[in-house]
Structure formats: structure tokens, C-alpha cells
């Protein structure tokens, strides 16, 4: 391999496309659940999946696979968090369709968020601020900043896991689907924005970060 080839930069996904890839499958899930009967009447093959939540689950799996495929084709890499989330979607989605039991897809956010929270907080026990490995390309922080941010995100992921359990066990399926899209995302965005003071306080310039 030549030096020029070795130095060839990776293709970066634009922020807008990244947002579409992350939110697209969720929007498909919401639309398919709310319009499941209409989709089943227009596309008989979908009717074989079952009721609206099962049609939504099948299309959610397909949209997730498409999002991962687009990400891979553009960057030749798959971000760790979307990859783990995608694997859980495929496993729990398949169980949902196979057993015709929507409990599995409802538990997917609980499993994913608990896993992320446990990994982040567990890494701190070994002196590793794992969040830095995920977001190091986005911004540079000192060690204390990464540690604090890792703690906050770890706790936040566990909070989302508990919140999902409360919602799906206490409310209807339609409410849970709507909250998954219109509740969880705004909460996550607000939490992310709330971390900006910490990020600015512990930011280091590129020269000091080397």
C-alpha cells in the first residue's frame, strides 16, 4: 500500500445525515405502528407479521439494517453504540415476531441503555473513561472532564432504562411507541445540551490534547 493510500482520510458523515440515520428507524417504527392496519391492507405481505406493533417491529429492523448499511458504505466503519443497539434490535425484534410477543421489543431500550450504562460506569472502576474513546473525534477534554462526563452519561443511560420499564409496563403500546420517539429523544437532547458547561470548562486545545 502506498503512502498516499495509507493517508487517505475516512469519509465523514455529515451531521444532518447522521441525524437521519439515527432518527430514521425510530420514525419508521412510529409511523408503522400508527398506520399498521393501512400498511397491512396495502401490502398483504406485512399482514403476515401480525398486528401494527409487529409490522412496526419488522420495518424497524429493516430500517435499522439500512441505516447501518449506509453508514458502512460511507465510512467503512460502524460506530460502536449504533452497532450494539442494532444487534439488540435484530435479536429482540426476531423474538418479538417469532413468538408474537411485543414484550421483547419493548424491553430492547431497557437492555441497550442498561448495557451502555454498565459499560461506562464499569469502565471507571478500572480507571477508564470509555466515553472518551467514543467522542474523542468530536471534542477534546482533560481527564477529569471525561471522567465526569462518563459518570453523567452512565447514570443517564440507567435512568433511561428505568424510565422505559415504567412506561411500557404502565401504559398502552401506542403510548410507549409515541414516548419512545417524542419523549426519549427530547429528554436526551436536553440532557446533552445540559452537558455543554462541563464540556466547555474541561475543553483543551488541540496542541495540549496531543
Curated annotation (Swiss-Prot):
Keyword annotations of the record: Cell inner membrane, Cell membrane, Membrane, Transmembrane, Transmembrane helix
Cellular component annotations (GO), alphabetically ordered: plasma membrane
Keyword Secreted: no
Domain of life: Bacteria
InterPro entries per record: YciB
NCBIfam families, per database record: ispZ (TIGR00997), PRK00259.1-1 (NF001323)
The name this protein goes by in its record: Inner membrane-spanning protein YciB
Amino acid at each position: 500500500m502506498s503512502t498516499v493510500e495509507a493517508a487517505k482520510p475516512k469519509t465523514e458523515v455529515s451531521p444532518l445525515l447522521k441525524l437521519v440515520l439515527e432518527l430514521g428507524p425510530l420514525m419508521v417504527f412510529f409511523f408503522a405502528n400508527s398506520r399498521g392496519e393501512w400498511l397491512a391492507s396495502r401490502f398483504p405481505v406485512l399482514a403476515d407479521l401480525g398486528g401494527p406493533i409487529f409490522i412496526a417491529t419488522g420495518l424497524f429492523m429493516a430500517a435499522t439494517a439500512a441505516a447501518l448499511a449506509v453508514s458502512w458504505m460511507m465510512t467503512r466503519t460502524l460506530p460502536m453504540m449504533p452497532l450494539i443497539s442494532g444487534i439488540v434490535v435484530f435479536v429482540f425484534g426476531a423474538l418479538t415476531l417469532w413468538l408474537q410477543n411485543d414484550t421483547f421489543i419493548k424491553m430492547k431500550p431497557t437492555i441497550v441503555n442498561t448495557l451502555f450504562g454498565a459499560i461506562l460506569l464499569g469502565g471507571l472502576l478500572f480507571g477508564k473513561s470509555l466515553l472518551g474513546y467514543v467522542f474523542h473525534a468530536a471534542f477534546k477534554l482533560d481527564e477529569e472532564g471525561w471522567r465526569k462526563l462518563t459518570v453523567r452519561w452512565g447514570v443517564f443511560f440507567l435512568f433511561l432504562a428505568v424510565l422505559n420499564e415504567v412506561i411500557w409496563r404502565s401504559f398502552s403500546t401506542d403510548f410507549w411507541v409515541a414516548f419512545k420517539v417524542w419523549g426519549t429523544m427530547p429528554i436526551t437532547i436536553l440532557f446533552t445540551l445540559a452537558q455543554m458547561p462541563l464540556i466547555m470548562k474541561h475543553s483543551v486545545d488541540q496542541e495540549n490534547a496531543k
